[in-house]
């Protein structure tokens, strides 16, 4: 267990935002499903991305890390056709994306697949896939409370009815898979679709790799079978979910110029800009760098988090220091992330002096003038909680003690290097101090 003592103090300088984890998952998968050689550039080797890379290796792709790019020989190439393991084990580590994207993909190959992982991954629901398996006669078994899923059987093309309010990852997983089947398929969305931005990223990546899908207003998707993922040179853009931490730091009167973001991005987490602007912050594009310029006071607002769940922890920090009451609604899905993020946000920020009431599907946040600090807080072993608390420390009255900070390696291993380069003041802390 790693523990940091982090001191108050504003951040100042420039930061290059790491490449988008969401886009990297998609780029690696599309390239690995291809029939030739692809190069993925500007990729960050976080724990989650390593899990997806290793998963695609288990399915037969030959993937090599070069100095400037990730070199991928696709599964459909002649070189890889005999490379797939018939009885394969796919270790997803703690990556929900790896698990939910790869489960249906694994069902296009002969043999059996065993999915394992750690942390809270075994608690994330997979009922959507179990229903498909039951309908198609695919054999599977699992253990409750831990990830140990075994699957044997071939997925067949057809019509699939999926809920849109559980996780968009199920829809993306099926979208990746169905173009490779022999016949045509249709996905029908039976509820309101949450996290549309993630579906847009999936469709965009697949289009870049030559796959055609008809999107009928997110109510249904028409997928032609027998398609081929082409091999391309693919560059990953900067990650808005990570930029959100430094934009909120700017909202709290730091001065961080944020580089390497695509302004016309499809990322759903780009909504952080619109949310902060509603909170009375001005965001400027200065020589292709974003800088948040806070006005005198941040103002409360109502935030629908259904389309941007990953930025809700750090947005909750900003809301804690707004004038008035902020309501963050439609965020019940945050309870089944790396931890129960609604509970973690409320409990840890309240320790610092915030005033947050946790509801089943929402957070009610009454703004306070200052955060006191001077206490021990816990990341809940969740990367986004850890980084949010580090940003919170910059405006506390007293230092904080952050336990289990290493979980940042899941998405942003260099976070504390960047935090330090911007003037963040922290050191390892031992219980004896």
From Swiss-Prot:
Main localisation: cytoplasm
Coiled-coil regions listed in the entry: none
Catalysis: reaction(s): 3-phosphoshikimate + phosphoenolpyruvate = 5-O-(1-carboxyvinyl)-3-phosphoshikimate + phosphate
Gene Ontology terms: biological process: amino acid biosynthetic process; aromatic amino acid family biosynthetic process; chorismate biosynthetic process
Name of this chain's protein: 3-phosphoshikimate 1-carboxyvinyltransferase
Cell compartments where the protein resides: Cytoplasm
Annotated metabolic or biological route of this protein: Metabolic intermediate biosynthesis; chorismate biosynthesis; chorismate from D-erythrose 4-phosphate and phosphoenolpyruvate: step 6/7
Cellular component GO terms held in the UniProt record: cytoplasm
The protein's role, per its UniProt record: Catalyzes the transfer of the enolpyruvyl moiety of phosphoenolpyruvate (PEP) to the 5-hydroxyl of shikimate-3-phosphate (S3P) to produce enolpyruvyl shikimate-3-phosphate and inorganic phosphate.
InterPro entries with a match to the protein in the record: Enolpyruvate_Tfrase_dom, Enolpyruvate_Tfrase_sf, EPSP_synthase, EPSP_synthase_CS, RNA3'P_cycl/enolpyr_Trfase_a/b
UniProt keyword Kinase present: no
Family: Belongs to the EPSP synthase family.
UniProt key word Amino-acid biosynthesis: yes
A Pfam short name: EPSP_synthase
UniProt KW keywords: Amino-acid biosynthesis, Aromatic amino acid biosynthesis, Cytoplasm, Transferase
Source organism (scientific name): Clostridium botulinum (strain Alaska E43 / Type E3)
Molecular-function annotations in GO: 3-phosphoshikimate 1-carboxyvinyltransferase activity
Record: residues binding 3-phosphoshikimate: 21-22, 26, 167-169, 195, 310, 337
Active-site residues annotated for this sequence: 310
């Amino acid at each position: 267990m790693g523990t940091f003592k982090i001191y108050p103090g504003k951040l100042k300088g420039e930061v290059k935002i790491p490449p988008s984890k969401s886009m990297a998952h998609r780029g690696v998968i599309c390239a690995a499903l291809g029939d030739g050689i692809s190069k993925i550039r500007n990729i960050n080797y976080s724990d989650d991305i390593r899990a997806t890379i290793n998963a695609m290796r288990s399915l037969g792709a030959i993937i090599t890390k070069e100095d400037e790019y990730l070199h991928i020989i696709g599964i459909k190439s002649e070189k890889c056709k005999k490379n797939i393991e018939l009885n394969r084990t796919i270790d997803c580590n703690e990556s929900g994306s790896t698990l939910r994207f790869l489960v249906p993909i694994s069902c296009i190959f002969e043999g059996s697949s065993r999915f394992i992982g750690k942390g809270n991954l075994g608690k994330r629901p997979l009922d959507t896939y179990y229903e498909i398996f039951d309908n198609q006669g695919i054999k599977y078994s699992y253990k409750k409370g831990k990830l140990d899923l075994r699957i044997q059987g071939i997925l067949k093309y057809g019509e699939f009815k999926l809920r849109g309010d559980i996780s968009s990852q199920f829809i993306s997983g099926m979208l990746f898979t169905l173009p490779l089947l022999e016949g045509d398929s249709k996905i029908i969305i039976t509820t309101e679709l949450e996290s549309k931005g993630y579906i847009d990223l999936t469709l965009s990546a697949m289009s870049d790799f030559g796959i055609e899908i008809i999107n009928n207003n997110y109510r249904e998707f028409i997928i032609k079978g027998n398609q081929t993922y082409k091999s391309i040179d693919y560059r990953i853009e900067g990650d808005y979910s990570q930029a959100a931490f430094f934009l909120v730091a700017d909202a709290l009167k730091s001065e961080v110029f944020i580089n390497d973001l695509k302004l016309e991005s499809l990322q759903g987490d780009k909504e952080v800009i619109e949310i902060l602007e509603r909170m009375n912050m001005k965001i400027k594009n200065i020589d292709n760098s974003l800088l948040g310029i806070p006005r005198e006071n941040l103002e409360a607002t109502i935030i629908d988090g259904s389309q941007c769940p990953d930025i809700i922890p750090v947005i909750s920090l900003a809301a804690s220091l707004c004038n008035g009451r902020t309501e963050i609604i439609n965020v019940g899905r945050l309870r089944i992330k790396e931890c129960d993020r609604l509970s973690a946000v409320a409990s840890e920020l309240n320790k610092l002096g915030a005033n947050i009431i946790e509801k089943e599907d929402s957070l009610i946040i009454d703004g306070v003038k200052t955060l006191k600090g001077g206490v021990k807080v816990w990341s809940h072993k969740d990367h986004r909680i850890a980084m949010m608390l580090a940003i919170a420390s910059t405006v506390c009255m007293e230092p904080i003690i952050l336990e289990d900070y290493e979980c940042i390696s899941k998405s942003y291993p260099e976070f504390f290097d960047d935090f330090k380069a911007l003037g963040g003041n922290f050191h390892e802390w031992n219980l004896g101090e």
